[in-house]
A protein has these predicted regions:
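Low-complexity, intrinsically disordered/propeptide-like segments
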Residues: 17-18, 25, 49, 77, ...
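C-terminal scaffold of the Radical SAM
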Residues: 29-41, 59-74, 78, 82, ...
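Local cysteine-cluster metal-coordination motifs and their immediate loop/turn environment
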Residues: 45-60
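Ser/Thr/Pro/Gly-rich low-complexity, intrinsically disordered segments
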Residues: 84-86
Length: 301
C-alpha cells in the first residue's frame, strides 16, 4: 500500500511501504523538479470525414447526418501527364457538419482541456496541430473559438506555430481566409496525388484541379504550407510518381511530406489489396521522388 507523508522540512514527499518492510526507494521533492519545464505541443483531433478512404487506419469517421452538396469545381482539370486540360472536371463537394454537432464537440474538447490543465501547468505552449479526420469540415468561427479557448488557458507566443489539416475536396476560399483570421498560420493539405485516376483509386473526393487551386490559395494566405503526397499507388509508374512530385514542387510550398502507400490492418485495402508496384519499381520510385525533392532544395528528415 502507499502512504503519503508530510513533505515539509525536507521530509520525503512519497514513501512506498509494505506490511513487512520499507520498499527500497524514497522519492525526495528535489528529484521531481526541473531546471525548466519542457515546452508543450498540443494535438487536437477532429475525427469526421466526407468519406472514409480505403487505405486509412486513422481515427476518422463519416459523421451521421452530414450534409454534403455537390458543387461545380474549376473547369481546369489534369490529364494523365499533369498538363492543364479543358475537359470538364468532376463534381466536387462543399461539405459541412451539422452546427450542433460541431458545437457539442467543441464544448467537449474544451472540457477535456480543462480537466488536463493541472498536468501541464507551468509549461509553455509552442505549437498546436489540428488533425483528423478532416478539420476543414469545421466552420472557421468554431476553429476561432477553439483556438481562443486554448490561448486563454495555456497562452501562446505570437510566433507559435498553429497547423491545421485540410482536404482539397472541401476547399472554399472563404473557409481558408477564415482559418487564417482565426490564427492558423500553417496549412497541411492532403493532396496524395494530382492524377485523377489515382485519386479515384484512393477513394479521394477531390480531383487534380481542385488540389492545385487549394494549394495555390493556401500559399497566398498562410505563412507555411505542407503538401501530403503518396507514392507507390495502384498501377503507378515511376514517371507518374515523379510527375506528382514535380507538380507539388512547382506550387512553391514550404514543406512536402512523401509517404509510401501501405496496407494497414483493419482497412478496406488490407482486406482487398489493390495491384501495387513491384519491389523493383518501388525502389525506382523512391529514388526518383526523393532525388527530385533534394534537387529542389528540400532536406530529408
Amino acid at each position: 500500500m502507499s502512504q503519503p507523508v508530510d513533505p515539509s522540512n525536507n521530509a520525503p514527499a512519497f514513501m512506498a511501504t509494505s506490511a513487512n518492510n520499507l520498499v527500497g526507494r524514497v522519492f525526495m521533492p528535489s528529484e521531481l523538479r526541473f531546471a525548466a519545464m519542457p515546452p508543450l505541443a498540443l494535438y487536437i483531433h477532429l475525427p469526421w470525414c466526407v468519406r472514409k478512404c480505403p487505405y486509412c487506419d486513422f481515427n476518422s469517421h463519416l459523421a451521421p447526418e452530414s450534409k454534403f452538396r455537390e458543387v461545380a469545381v474549376p473547369v481546369r482539370s489534369l490529364n494523365a501527364k499533369h498538363v492543364e486540360s479543358t475537359e470538364p472536371a468532376e463534381q466536387g463537394y462543399a461539405a459541412s457538419l451539422p452546427l450542433d454537432l460541431q458545437r457539442r464537440y467543441l464544448n467537449a474538447l474544451i472540457a477535456d482541456l480543462d480537466q488536463q490543465l493541472p498536468k501541464v501547468w507551468g509549461r509553455k505552449l509552442y505549437s498546436i496541430f489540428i488533425g483528423g479526420g478532416t478539420p476543414s469540415l469545421f466552420e472557421p468561427s468554431l476553429i476561432d473559438e477553439l483556438l481562443a479557448a486554448v490561448r486563454a488557458r495555456l497562452g501562446m507566443p505570437q510566433t507559435g506555430e498553429i497547423t491545421m489539416e485540410a482536404n482539397p475536396g472541401t476547399f472554399e476560399q472563404a473557409r481558408f481566409e477564415g482559418y487564417r483570421k482565426a490564427g492558423v498560420n500553417r496549412l497541411s493539405i492532403g493532396v496524395q496525388s494530382f492524377s485523377d485516376s489515382h485519386l479515384k483509386a484512393l477513394g479521394r473526393v477531390h480531383n487534380g484541379g481542385q488540389a492545385i487551386d487549394a494549394v495555390r490559395s493556401a500559399v497566398a494566405l498562410f505563412d507555411e504550407v505542407n503538401i501530403d503526397l503518396m507514392y507507390a499507388l495502384p498501377h503507378q509508374s515511376v514517371d507518374q510518381a515523379l510527375a506528382d512530385v514535380k507538380q507539388a514542387l512547382a506550387l512553391n510550398t514550404t514543406h512536402l511530406s512523401l509517404y509510401q502507400l501501405t496496407m494497414e490492418p483493419n482497412t478496406l485495402f488490407a482486406a482487398k489489396p489493390p495491384p501495387l508496384p513491384d519491389d523493383d519499381t518501388l525502389v525506382d520510385i523512391e529514388e526518383a521522388v526523393q532525388g527530385a525533392a533534394r534537387n529542389a532544395g528540400f532536406e530529408h528528415y
